Amino acid sequence: MKTSIVERPAQHWVGYRLQGPWQETVPQGFAQLKDWVARHALQGEWMAIYYGNPQVVPPQELSVETVLTVPADFALAVGEGIQHGTLAGGHYFHTCTEVQNNDFFSAWNAFFAQLQQRSDWQVDDRPCYEHYLSDGSQSGNWLLNMYIPVRPV
């Protein structure tokens, strides 16, 4: 797995925040977002922003934002039921990987193991996120960028 530290800009987004087990909320959030995006003919980067550590937080307390990036000046119509937010920029530990058979758990575990081998960077309190480069919703196979927020030790 090739990894690197990258500097990412802040990214503005529209999307849905859901709470509960990620294996349920992520597909649900993207289904909602896909319908909303189709009605508004928008284009952008598809991402999932994760809140909570699944090794210590009960599944029902985990949260995710399923989002599409938009320009900074994007104006969201009132009453649409969708949220507008900003993903913080800064340093991130990055990899581009292929997930097979929807096994995101193994991909994240391997990625975190790579970070733990480094002594010069540590995880900070911003959320981890995925940027999807392909749609694996039918095949279960995904190409994506994974990001862990970090700060120097």
UniProtKB/Swiss-Prot annotation:
Keywords: Cytoplasm, Stress response
Predominant subcellular localization, coarse grouping: cytoplasm
InterPro entries, alphabetized: AraC_E-bd, DNA_gyrase_inhibitor, DNA_gyrase_inhibitor_GyrI, GyrI-like, Reg_factor_effector_dom_sf
Organism superkingdom: Bacteria
Subcellular location: Cytoplasm
Annotated transmembrane regions: none
Entry GO terms, CC: cytoplasm
One Pfam family recorded for the sequence: GyrI-like
Keyword hit for Ubl conjugation: no
GO molecular function per UniProt: DNA topoisomerase type II (double strand cut, ATP-hydrolyzing) inhibitor activity
Function: Inhibits the supercoiling activity of DNA gyrase. Acts by inhibiting DNA gyrase at an early step, prior to (or at the step of) binding of DNA by the gyrase. It protects cells against toxins that target DNA gyrase, by inhibiting activity of these toxins and reducing the formation of lethal double-strand breaks in the cell.
Self-association and partners: Interacts with DNA gyrase.
Family indicated by similarity: Belongs to the DNA gyrase inhibitor family.
Name the UniProt record assigns to this protein: DNA gyrase inhibitor
